[in-house]
Curated annotation (Swiss-Prot):
Functional note: Essential for the assembly of ubiquinol-cytochrome c reductase. It has a direct effect on the correct occurrence of the Rieske protein, core 4, core 5 and apocytochrome b.
Segments forming a coiled coil: 105-139
SUPFAM superfamilies: Moesin tail domain
Keywords per UniProt: Chaperone, Coiled coil, Membrane, Mitochondrion, Mitochondrion inner membrane, Transmembrane, Transmembrane helix
Transmembrane parts of this sequence: 5-27
Gene: CBP4
Presence of keyword Chaperone: yes
Family affiliation: Belongs to the CBP4 family.
Species per Swiss-Prot/TrEMBL record: Candida glabrata (strain ATCC 2001 / BCRC 20586 / JCM 3761 / NBRC 0622 / NRRL Y-65 / CBS 138) (Yeast)
Single biological process term from Gene Ontology: mitochondrial respiratory chain complex III assembly
MF GO annotations: actin binding
Protein name: Assembly factor CBP4
Membrane topology summary: Single-pass membrane protein
CC per GO annotation: mitochondrial inner membrane
């Protein structure tokens, strides 16, 4: 004997709802928060993340400013505004090669890293020079105090 149609639909809704609810709960309780994810990183990666946070926020702010300007304009959506499109070409057919904001940020970040590395190397070199000068002066003072003609 067949069950009524409404019971079949009720089973479908119950099973479907339980699958969806189970998936949502599983996702909610198994996905780590941003803080937990950052805390689980190695110390080197966590330090790099903290250093680059300001840069990422600045990039996001600039991108949002560009998006808002583009949204206010009456131009078609495929015109990218200040961000250079890789598909836009000049009249002569050559690809436009302009440096956009994000390339400048990357270049600035690389220059800062290079300056930091040079500063670290200079400090290390200065400390090595100081150690070398100290050892040299110790050796010279030791030899001055021990003349070859003195017995004691």
């Amino acid at each position: 004997m067949d069950t009524p149609v409404w019971r079949r639909w009720l089973k479908i809704y119950i099973y479907g709802g339980s699958i969806i609810l189970g998936g949502v709960l599983l996702f909610k309780y198994t996905t780590p928060t941003d803080e937990k994810l950052i805390a689980s990183l190695s110390p080197e990666l966590r330090l790099q993340y903290e250093k680059e946070r300001k840069l990422r926020q600045e990039e996001q702010r600039e991108l949002m400013r560009i998006v808002q300007e583009t949204a206010k304009s009456n131009e078609p959506i495929w015109k990218t505004g200040p961000i250079d499109s890789p598909w836009e070409k000049k009249k002569g057919g050559e690809v436009v090669k302009n440096e956009n904001f994000f390339d400048k940020i990357q270049k600035t970040r690389a220059e800062e890293a290079q300056k930091d590395e040079l500063q670290r190397i200079r400090e290390e070199l200065d400390s090595l020079r100081a150690q070398s000068m100290k050892k040299t002066s110790d050796i010279v003072n030791e030899r001055k105090s021990k003349d070859w003609w003195k017995i004691w």
